[in-house]
Each structure stands twice: as structure tokens, then as C-alpha cells.
């Protein structure tokens, strides 16, 4: 199964759906779903996902290279792994999504969207995670969902962590720093993301890794993310990664800007970078007689997007943590 990406993009079902790799067994489950199980017993389970948005190709290429290293035997596997290429049709078309944004649908929220390939895929992925986690006795559960951002950023690589009732494990946060993430953003409320689903329903330590900017296949400079790729290789093979000399900056979400109607106006232009700072009192958005302003001394914007569909998030506002 050294042609997993090509099969996924072509929508082709392989003639052989399971086999042996170098020290592990592989099983093709469905388009964009591949399970890897080490020959030796392990108590760690990892979801490695990318391509939830079809125009975010750099992480997909990274996963493809990791799979090649595993199949060649140059990388040893020490986790049970479920590799997920989230939205095969959008990946093949080179577009963000075909009908609706899948990363708003998880946790059953797909039921509130018009039925589409994305709603069916979200349901399939939920069931795939349930089967994967229930079929093992993993003491450690991680989910790393790899993305790229639409906009440029003051932090080239950063992580977004779902709301979690329990404290985050220091080893997990330290690994994210070792993977080259310059900032970590902590959600304070539940959401429909893939990582919130895996965290809430299966207790996984989950993070959305944002790695640079969305570009088509073949146009990515993967050397920008070599530190992340090296950290993933070390993780898969069970090698300790050195702690980052510059721990990631930490932010928490303090508010969400939502577009409710066609009257919505977001006062940020196309050049506004993620993590741009705004002073207290700055007018951020208007919609009819509703005004959205900065309420803390300084707030930082994340994922500003005035073109989202009505009812969806047009941006997050953050505050820096000490």
C-alpha cells in the first residue's frame, strides 16, 4: 500500500486491501482510510489526519512521505495508527470543500446540514474513529489533524486545541512545541471540529496543527515544515524529541465573530494576518445595529473570513496567556 494517496485521489479501490509492511500490518478500510498495526503489542493509538479541507495539500504530502518511510522500513512503527485523508473528493478537485465545511460537522452536527458528500463523510469518519478506538486497549490516545491556513500568519506554524474539561498533559504540549509550533490556541467552548470530536468522545489528546498556507499539490515547500515532519517521524518510531528552546506562546479564545446575514461587515482586509493585534475599543465587525468591538486591552484575530455562509464563524478573537 505505497500508493495510498494516488488511490485516494483517483477514487480507486485497491485489488489487495490488506498486507504486511516492515514490522506492521496494514489494512485499507475505505477511500482515504488506512489502518496500520505494529506486529509487536502496543498500548498507544494515534489518528493522523489531513485533507479535511481539500485545498490544504502540504500536510497530505507530508503524510504520504511518512507512509513511504514506513513501507520502506526506514521508519519503525510503535503506535496503532489510523491515517485519514478527510475529504477525498475535494482533494481530487483541489477545492476547500464540495458543498459544506466538514470541520463544522463533527459530533453529530452533520445532521443539521443539507445532506451532501461531506455530511456522509463526516458520519463515516465518526464511525471509523469509534471502531478504531474500540478495537484496541490503548492507554494513550492522540489525534493530530494537519491543516494549512487560508491566510498568512504572524506564527507560521501553530496549534488549535479543543475545549477540554481536564488539564492538558504536559508531555503532549511539549511535543507540540518540539514539532515547531510557535503558538497554541486553547478553545473554551465545544465545537464541530474533528479534533473536538475525538477529544470529547474518546478522550484523545487532540490538536489541529496549522502548517503554513494553503497551496495546490506540487507547489508546497515542505522544507518549511521539516521540524514538524521530523517530530512526527520520531513520534511514530517511539523516539524522544528534544524540548523546544522557545516554548509556544499560548492564547485562549475570548469571543467568536459570527456572520448571521448579508448585512454582515468584517473590518479586516485580505492582508490581515492571523494573530494581528487590535487595541481595546477597535470596531471589528457590524451587522445591522450590532457592533463587535475589542473588549480586552489587546486581542488577536484568528481565521478572519467575511465570506463564510450565514450562521458560521467569521473569526475568533484571542487573548495572550502569561
Swiss-Prot record:
Domain of life (superkingdom): Bacteria
Cofactor descriptive note: Binds 1 zinc ion per subunit.
GO BP annotation list: arginine catabolic process to glutamate; arginine catabolic process to succinate
UniProt GO molecular function: hydrolase activity, acting on ester bonds; succinylglutamate desuccinylase activity; zinc ion binding
Cofactor: Zn(2+)
Pathway note: Amino-acid degradation; L-arginine degradation via AST pathway; L-glutamate and succinate from L-arginine: step 5/5
The UniProt record lists the keyword Translocase: no
InterPro entries assigned to the protein according to its UniProt record, in alphabetical order: AspA/AstE_fam, AstE_AspA_cat, Aste_AspA_hybrid_dom, SuccinylGlu_desuccinylase
Catalytic activity: N-succinyl-L-glutamate + H2O = L-glutamate + succinate
Residues forming the catalytic site: 210
Record keyword Repeat present: no
Position of the signal peptide: none
EC numbers: 3.5.1.96
Principal EC category: hydrolase
Task performed by this protein: Transforms N(2)-succinylglutamate into succinate and glutamate.
Protein name: Succinylglutamate desuccinylase
Organism: Salmonella paratyphi A (strain AKU_12601)
Record gene name: astE
Amino acid at each position: 500500500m505505497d500508493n495510498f494517496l494516488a488511490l485516494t485521489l483517483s477514487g480507486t479501490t485497491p485489488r489487495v486491501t490488506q498486507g504486511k509492511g516492515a514490522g506492521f500490518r496494514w489494512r485499507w478500510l475505505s477511500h482515504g482510510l488506512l489502518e496500520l498495526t505494529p506486529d509487536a503489542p502496543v498500548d498507544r493509538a494515534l489518528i493522523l489526519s489531513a485533507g479535511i479541507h481539500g485545498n490544504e495539500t502540504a500536510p497530505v504530502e507530508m503524510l504520504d512521505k511518512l507512509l513511504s518511510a514506513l513501507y520502506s522500513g526506514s521508519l519503525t512503527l510503535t503506535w496503532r495508527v489510523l491515517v485519514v485523508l478527510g475529504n477525498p473528493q475535494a482533494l481530487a478537485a483541489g477545492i476547500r470543500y464540495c458543498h459544506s465545511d466538514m470541520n463544522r460537522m463533527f459530533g453529530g452536527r452533520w445532521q443539521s446540514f443539507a445532506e451532501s458528500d461531506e455530511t456522509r463523510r463526516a458520519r463515516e469518519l465518526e464511525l471509523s474513529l469509534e471502531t478504531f478506538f474500540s478495537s484496541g486497549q490503548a492507554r494513550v490516545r492522540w489525534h493530530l489533524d494537519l491543516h494549512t491556513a487560508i491566510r498568512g500568519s504572524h506564527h507560521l506554524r501553530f496549534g488549535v486545541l479543543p475545549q477540554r474539561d481536564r488539564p492538558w498533559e504536559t508531555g503532549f504540549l511539549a511535543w507540540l512545541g518540539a514539532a515547531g509550533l510557535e503558538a497554541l490556541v486553547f478553545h473554551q467552548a465545544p465545537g464541530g471540529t474533528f479534533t473536538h470530536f475525538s477529544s470529547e468522545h474518546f478522550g484523545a489528546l487532540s490538536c489541529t496543527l496549522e502548517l503554513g498556507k494553503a497551496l495546490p499539490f506540487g507547489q508546497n515547500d515542505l522544507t518549511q515544515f521539516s521540524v514538524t515532519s521530523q517530530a512526527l517521524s520520531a513520534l511514530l518510531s517511539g523516539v524522544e524529541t528534544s524540548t523546544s528552546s522557545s516554548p509556544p506562546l499560548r492564547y485562549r479564545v475570548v469571543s467568536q465573530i459570527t456572520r448571521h446575514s448579508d448585512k454582515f461587515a468584517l473590518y479586516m482586509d485580505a492582508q490581515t494576518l492571523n494573530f494581528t493585534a487590535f487595541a481595546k475599543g477597535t470596531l471589528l465587525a457590524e451587522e445591522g445595529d450590532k457592533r463587535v468591538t475589542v473588549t480586552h486591552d489587546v486581542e488577536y484575530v484568528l481565521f478572519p473570513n467575511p465570506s463564510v455562509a450565514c450562521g458560521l464563524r467569521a473569526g475568533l478573537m484571542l487573548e495572550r496567556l502569561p
